[in-house]
């Protein structure tokens, strides 16, 4: 009798510093993820400032046989630098460089855990996302080494929703030097940007130049040396950009899957939108 294909072992992981109402929606969406072809474990780095959030995370891993790592266990911090400076309000999220690279350190510990425990891949997710139940199965089905699930964000109130993926540099939604129509370079950039954004609204799997926040990463990528460490001669802001540059330099392509967009609770006023999913 022919044996069925063995299930892949995926670690679902996140460094968590989140308000309790948002965290509740995130965790509930993890519970309903389909797992037809995969087995999953949970790993969270508890970086919460709210006791209610830490308690909620602890209850979740108890019920779902997950693991929590405390920040103290993975970072050497003195009291003056503990937690770092990060705030958010209805206007947006505000990061200082020290906090960005602190989070990079937490993510690197997750990657190390994946390699040490021989998982096939890690699904690294930000804790303010609400996932469609098919998300993980869809990402695995692409068979890509690095693939993000699309989500959209209004970075400023009332602004246009924008994706968490891009094509070049820090957040360029066009490819410099590519001519798609007659006219100026600026005209071509505008047209390319619109074409790219429209593409992301159609179900598919597309190659991109940068991604983050909701990403399936295969273990062989990590074993090749891809991390969130800062690249000293690159000034781009954000650990995801340094991850992507390092991945591309080591020969790994980056993809985004747009079949099941996640919902981003970027501000508390967007919390009611979860009910409309």
Q: Where do the protein language model's features map onto the residues?
A:
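Hydrophobic targeting segments
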Residues: 8-14, 30, 40-45
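Short, well-formed alpha-helical segments that are part of the catalytic scaffolds
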Residues: 19-33, 55-56
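Short beta-strand-to-loop acidic/aromatic patch adjacent to the donor-nucleotide binding site
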Residues: 118-130
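Short beta-strand/loop segment that forms part of the nucleotide-sugar
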Residues: 39-49, 71-78
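C-terminal catalytic/acceptor-binding lobe
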Residues: 197-277
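Active-site-proximal specificity loops/subdomain of glycosyltransferases
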Residues: 56-119
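Short, acidic, metal-binding catalytic loop of nucleotide-sugar glycosyltransferases
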Residues: 28-39, 49, 63
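Conserved catalytic core of nucleotide-sugar-dependent glycosyltransferases
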Residues: 111, 132-231
């Amino acid at each position: 009798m022919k044996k069925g294909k063995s299930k892949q072992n995926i670690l679902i992981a996140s460094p968590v510093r989140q308000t309790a109402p948002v965290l509740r929606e995130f965790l509930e969406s993890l519970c309903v993820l389909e797992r037809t072809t995969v087995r999953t474990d949970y790993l969270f780095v508890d970086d919460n400032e709210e006791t209610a959030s830490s308690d909620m995370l602890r209850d979740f891993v108890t019920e779902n046989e997950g693991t929590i790592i405390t920040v103290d266990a993975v970072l050497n911090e003195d009291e003056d630098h503990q937690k770092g400076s990060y705030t958010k309000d209805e206007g947006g999220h505000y990061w200082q460089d020290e906090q960005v690279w602190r989070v990079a350190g937490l993510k690197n510990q997750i990657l190390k855990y994946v390699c040490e425990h021989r998982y096939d891949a890690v699904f690294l997710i930000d804790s303010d996302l609400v996932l469609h139940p098919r998300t993980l199965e869809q990402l695995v089905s692409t068979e890509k080494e690095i693939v993000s699930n699309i989500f959209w964000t209004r970075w400023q109130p009332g602004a246009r929703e924008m994706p968490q993926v891009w094509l070049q540099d820090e957040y360029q939604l066009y490819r410099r030097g590519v001519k798609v129509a007659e006219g100026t370079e600026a005209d071509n950039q505008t047209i390319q940007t619109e074409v790219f954004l429209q593409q992301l609204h159609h179900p598919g799997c597309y190659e991109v130049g940068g991604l983050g926040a909701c990403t399936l990463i295969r273990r062989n990528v990590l074993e090749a040396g891809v991390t969130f460490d800062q690249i000293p001669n690159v000034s781009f802001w954000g650990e995801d950009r340094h991850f992507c540059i390092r991945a591309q330099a080591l020969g790994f392509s980056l993809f985004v899957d747009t079949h099941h967009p996640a919902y981003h609770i970027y501000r508390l006023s967007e919390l009611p939108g979860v009910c409309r999913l």
